[in-house]
Amino acid sequence: MLQIVIDNLEALKLDYSRFSVQKNYFNSEMISITLICSFPNKVGELTIWNDLSRVKEWIDYETEKINCLERKEFDTLENLINDLYLFIEECC
């Protein structure tokens, strides 16, 4: 399931000067991926888990405080990927 998300990200040809992707493993199994979006004053992170849930957070660089933290669960992979696209739009 996470490989489909990664394939979608690769198809977008993101600007990797602003975005980075981190794959997280447990016992050699990929359990989540994190899309990180960097701005001069804040960073956004969207972590997608293999159970069709995601956590989105925005962190202020100066204070290192989380400005927004949101967890959401999805019933389909398509809805999760649509939410991923919304996060990417927020970052542009």
Give the role of each language-model region.
Residues E29, E89-C92:
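Charged interaction patches that mediate protein-protein contacts
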Residues M1-F39, E62-L77:
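Negatively charged, low-complexity tracts enriched in Asp/Glu with abundant Ser/Thr
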Residues I81-E90:
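Divalent cation-coordinating acidic motifs and surrounding scaffolds
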Residues S53-T63:
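Amphipathic beta-strand/beta-sheet edge segments enriched in Tyr/Trp
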Residues T47-D51:
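Short beta-strand micro-motifs enriched in acidic
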Residues N41-G44:
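Short, charged/polar, Gly/Pro-enriched secondary-structure boundary elements
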